[in-house]
A protein has these predicted regions:
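Active-site neighborhood of phospho(di)ester-bond hydrolases with catalytic His/Asp-centered motifs
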Residues: 1, 19-26, 54-58, 71, ...
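Conserved beta-sheet core of the metallophosphoesterase superfamily
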Residues: 103-169
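Binuclear metal-dependent phosphoesterase catalytic core
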Residues: 61, 143-203
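Active-site-proximal segments of metal-dependent phosphoesterases and phosphodiesterases across multiple
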Residues: 4, 75-121, 128, 132
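Active-site environment of divalent metal-dependent phosphoester hydrolases
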Residues: 21-34, 61, 76-78, 97-101, ...
Length: 204
């Protein structure tokens, strides 16, 4: 119940600022049983808010001067057919990308390759909790946005928040959010380090 309240609150508040577009993530449904209803559909359907747009399936969705190029996990992140247009083509993707890393240094070798993003002007990605930038075909940029706040001891304290893409200027900026209750990892050589205040924070 608390999670439903939170999702309703955050989507409603975001929709007061601007039209809010979202896609499905790996925690929102059972990939092994697609006959089950996903977690987001009932919430969004009940809100009946025209400014909350849920693109569950893969496809290209025209939204004024933007073409949302949606890669859906429901459809195994297949590349949708991208037609030529004057609109800015922004890919929306959720999944691991080959070559990207986590905060503890794990490198994804078996993730999705970047060739599937050919035709996009920009791609916004979710899944890996570490914020990072990578290149897609056409020398365009893609952004793994990362987690909104630090989730556990395996993540850095800083470099979490959200990103803003300025369509007219073709610029992307990140906004950091401060976690009031961070997970802190300290390194010590002995108990004396704690007693003397010489412990070293290692996951800033």
């Amino acid at each position: 119940p608390e999670l439903i309240n939170f999702v309703v609150w955050i989507l409603t508040e975001c929709s007061k600022i601007c039209k809010t577009v979202l896609i499905i993530g790996n925690h929102d449904f059972l990939e092994s049983n697609l006959s089950r209803v996903d977690a987001l559909s009932p919430i969004i359907d009940s809100l009946k808010n025209p400014d909350i747009i849920y693109y569950k399936d893969s496809g290209v969705y025209v939204d004024e001067n933007i073409d949302w190029v949606v890669y859906s996990l429901v459809n195994h992140n297949v590349r949708p057919e991208i037609d030529k247009s004057d609109n800015v083509k922004i890919g929306l993707f959720h999944g691991p990308i080959q070559g990207l890393t986590t905060d503890i240094g794990y490198k994804f070798e078996d993730g999705f390759d970047t060739d599937r993003f050919k035709g996009c002007d920009l791609v916004l990605c979710g899944d890996i909790h570490k914020r990072q930038t990578f290149t897609i075909p056409g020398k365009k940029k893609a952004y793994m946005i990362g987690s909104t706040i630090q989730q556990n001891f395996g993540e850095s304290v800083k470099n979490h928040g959200y990103g803003i893409y300025h369509v007219n200027d073709d610029k992307y900026e990140t906004i950091d959010l401060i976690n009031p209750r961070p997970f802190l990892n300290f390194k010590i050589k002995s108990i004396e380090d704690l007693e003397k205040g010489n412990e070293r924070l290692v996951n800033v």
